[in-house]
Regions:
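Surface-exposed binding/hinge segments that line
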Residues: 5, 76, 120-162
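Detector for C-terminal structural segments
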Residues: 23-26, 45, 187, 261, ...
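N-terminal lobe/hinge region of extracytoplasmic solute-binding protein
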Residues: 28-79, 109, 176-178
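A structural "hinge/loop" feature
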Residues: 31-47, 71, 97, 119, ...
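Gly/Pro-rich hinge or "lid" segments in bacterial periplasmic/extracellular proteins
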Residues: 61-66, 153-205, 209, 326, ...
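Aromatic- and charge-enriched surface segment that lines or borders ligand/interaction sites
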Residues: 73-116, 132, 138, 221-224, ...
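Ligand-site clamp/hinge motif
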Residues: 197-243, 372
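Structural transition elements
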Residues: 269, 302-334, 352-357
Length: 503
C-alpha cells in the first residue's frame, strides 16, 4: 500500500500543470494522437481525436452506432458500382469556407496518395468521382464494395482550399474541418485543446472548451482520477477497480467492447509456424481462462473468433482449441519439435488493457510445453511500425472494424500482404493462405446480405480451423466519470471520445 501511495504521489507530480478552470471539460485517455491529418492513420485512437475536428459524410452516434446522416443528408447504392451521396447545405468549415462537393472529391482523391494517407483500402476502391452539382457526389467503384457506405463515418472531409498546398507538418498546426470543435493547440505528450464550433450544423456542443490529455501510464491516469484532475478517464486499470469503486467522487461506467485481443502469427515456409500442428499446439498451450481471471480480473470475455456479434461474418458456435498442455506437447513432437524451438512473444506495453502482462503469461504458457520463449514488448509507437514492416512471427494485437463487416477486416488482417492493392496492411506476420485469399476476394463482390454473411462466415471458420490467429478475448471498456459537474457520458462501441456527445 505504501508503495502504491508513493507511486501515486510521483504520478500526480507528473501531471500537466494546467488549471481545470481554464477548460470546461478535461478527458484523460490512454493513447496520444500520431497526427492531425485525419487520413494518416486508421487507428481508433487517432480517429477518436479527429472525430472532434472533422465530419464524415455519415456518422455512427452513441449509443448504438447506427449509420446516420452527417455531411450527407441521404445516400443510396444506385447499382453494383455506383453510390450517390446528397450533401447537406449551409455547412461551413472552421475558417468560414463553404462545404460542398468539391471538398468531398478533393478529400477522396487526396486519400489515394500514400504520402498523405494510409486509408488506401477504401480510396483505391474508387474508380471515379463525379460532382454534377455542388451538393451531389457520385462514386464509381472499381468493383462492387458492399461496405462502401459503412466506412463513411471515418473518412473525414477536409477543406480543399486550405489543405491542397500544405504538407503534414503544416497541417498538424491547423487542421481544418467542419466538426463540432475547432482545433486550438496540440502539445505533444501533454494535451490536445479544442474550442466549441458555435456554428456547428447540429448545434453548438455543451462544453465550450475541451482538453484531451493522453496518459499512457496506468498509475498516472489513476492519479488524475484520484486528484480530480480530470472529468472523464478512459483506460481505467482493472487492477485498481476495487479502489476506484471506493472513491465517493467517482462513477465507473463499463460496457462490453468490440475489440478482440488476439495472437497474430506467421506461417512462412521454413519456420515452425508453417506446420499447422505447431499453430494448434500454441493455441492449446494458452490458458485464456486464467488470463481473464488473474490478469483481466474478470473484465473480459473469452472468444474463439475476432469479429464480434454485431459484425457481418460472426459465427455462432465456433469453439476455441481448449487449454491442454499435454496435447500441445504431443502436437509439437509430431511436428518434429519434441525439444521445442525458440519463439519470441512480441507486443505493445502501452496499447491494450494489461497487454504486457498478457504477453508475459503467454510466454510462460509456451515455456511450460517446452518452447524456448522470450519476450519482446515495447511502446506501441515502435511496435506498430514493426508490424507494418512484418517483422514478427508471433505477436499480441487488438482489432475491431468500424464497418461492422468482416470482409474489410479480412482484407487487412488475413489476406496475403499486397501493399499495392492495400491488402494485408495489418497482417503483421505476413500469414498467407491462397484459399483464404480467394475466399476474401470472392466475398468482396457479394452484395446480397444473406449470401455475403454466409461467405464471410466461411472465411471466419477457415481462419479458426487453420489457426491463422489465436483469438483470446474481447476487452471490457471501463471509464470513470468524476461527479460534480453533472457530466453525462455514454461510452461508444468504438471507444472514440466524441466531445459533442458528452452532455
Amino acid at each position: 500500500m505504501k508503495r502504491i501511495a508513493i507511486a501515486l504521489m510521483v504520478a500526480l507530480l507528473a501531471l500537466p500543470a494546467v488549471c481545470l478552470a481554464q477548460v470546461a471539460l478535461v478527458v484523460v485517455t490512454d493513447a496520444p494522437p500520431k497526427s492531425m491529418n485525419p487520413h494518416a492513420y486508421s487507428s481508433d485512437a487517432n480517429l477518436s481525436y479527429m472525430s472532434n475536428f472533422f465530419d464524415g459524410l455519415l456518422q455512427r452516434p452513441a449509443p448504438d452506432g447506427k449509420l446516420s446522416p452527417a455531411l450527407a443528408e441521404s445516400w443510396e447504392r444506385v447499382d453494383a458500382l455506383t453510390w450517390t451521396f446528397n450533401l447537406r447545405k449551409g455547412v461551413k468549415f472552421h475558417n468560414g469556407n463553404d462545404f460542398n462537393a468539391a471538398d468531398v472529391k478533393f478529400t477522396f482523391e487526396r486519400m489515394k496518395d500514400p504520402q498523405y494517407s494510409k486509408l488506401l483500402n477504401i480510396a483505391n476502391s474508387i474508380e471515379s468521382i463525379e460532382t454534377p452539382d455542388d451538393f451531389t457526389v457520385i462514386f464509381k467503384t472499381v468493383k462492387p464494395v458492399p461496405w462502401f457506405a459503412e466506412t463513411m463515418h471515418q473518412n473525414f472531409i477536409v477543406d480543399m482550399e486550405s489543405t491542397k498546398d500544405r504538407d503534414d507538418g503544416e497541417y498538424n498546426t491547423q487542421p481544418m474541418g467542419t466538426g463540432a470543435y475547432k482545433f486550438v493547440e496540440w502539445v505533444k505528450g501533454s494535451y490536445v485543446r479544442m474550442q466549441a464550433n458555435e456554428n456547428y450544423w447540429e448545434g453548438a456542443p455543451k462544453y465550450k472548451t475541451v482538453e484531451i490529455r493522453p496518459i499512457t501510464e496506468e498509475a498516472t491516469r489513476f492519479a488524475a482520477l484520484a486528484g480530480k484532475q480530470a472529468d472523464i478517464v478512459n483506460g481505467v486499470p482493472v487492477t485498481l477497480i476495487e479502489r476506484i469503486e471506493k472513491m465517493p467522487h467517482v462513477e465507473l461506467i463499463s460496457r462490453p467492447a468490440r475489440r478482440a485481443i488476439y495472437m497474430g502469427m506467421s506461417n512462412k515456409p521454413g519456420t515452425p509456424f508453417a506446420d499447422i500442428r505447431v499453430r494448434q499446439a500454441i493455441a492449446h498451450a494458452i490458458n485464456e481462462d486464467e488470463i481473464i481471471e488473474k490478469i483481466m480480473r474478470g473484465q473480459a470475455t473469452a472468444t474463439a473468433q475476432v469479429p464480434d456479434p454485431p459484425t457481418v461474418g460472426y459465427l455462432d458456435g465456433l469453439e476455441r482449441l481448449p487449454y491442454d498442455p499435454e496435447t500441445a506437447k504431443k502436437l509439437l513432437a509430431e511436428a518434429g519439435y519434441a525439444d521445442g524451438f525458440e519463439i519470441t512473444v512480441a507486443g505493445p506495453n502501452d496499447r491494450y488493457v494489461n497487454d504486457e502482462k498478457i504477453c508475459e503469461a503467454v510466454a510462460k504458457y509456451l515455456a511450460k510445453v517446452g518452447l524456448k520463449a522470450k519476450l519482446d514488448v515495447k511502446p506501441k509507437s515502435i511496435f506498430f511500425d514493426e508490424i507494418n514492416e512484418f517483422k514478427h512471427h508471433f505477436y499480441l494485437i487488438g482489432w475491431f472494424d468500424g464497418s461492422f463487416d468482416l470482409g474489410r477486416s479480412a482484407e487487412k488482417l488475413l489476406h496475403t500482404p499486397d501493399p499495392d492493392k492495400g491488402m494485408g496492411a495489418y497482417n503483421g506476420g505476413a500469414y498467407s493462405d491462397p484459399e483464404l485469399d480467394k475466399m476474401i476476394i470472392e466475398s468482396s463482390s457479394i452484395l446480397d446480405r444473406a449470401e455475403r454473411e454466409k461467405a464471410l462466415q466461411a472465411i471466419n471458420r477457415r481462419s479458426v480451423e487453420e489457426v491463422a490467429w489465436i483469438p483470446l478475448h474481447y476487452q471490457q471498456d471501463i471509464f470513470a466519470v468524476v461527479k460534480g459537474k453533472d457530466v453525462k457520458f455514454m461510452p461508444r462501441s468504438d471507444r472514440w471520445i466524441v466531445a459533442k456527445e458528452i452532455k
